[in-house]
Amino acid sequence: MKVTCVLVLTLMALTVCQVATAYCINVGMCIYDGYCCSNRCWGGMCSPWR
């Protein structure tokens, strides 16, 4: 997981990075426990593998 939430927050202008659950956004990135990762999305959750 990479701490790129600041970048996402700037682009999305939302507080989605503060959500405790994992959600997929249109950019193809995942948000999990406040952290954004470039892993693939599976069922709206962040996949542990790329």
Swiss-Prot record:
Disulfide bonds join 24-37, 30-41, 36-46. The keyword Disulfide bond applies. The cysteine framework is VI/VII (C-C-CC-C-C). The presence of a 'disulfide through disulfide knot' structurally defines this protein as a knottin. This is Conotoxin Cal6.19. GO terms for cellular component: extracellular region. Expressed by the venom duct. Keywords: Disulfide bond, Knottin, Neurotoxin, Secreted, Signal, Toxin. It is found in: Secreted. GO terms for molecular function: toxin activity. Residues 1-22 form the signal peptide. Probable neurotoxin.
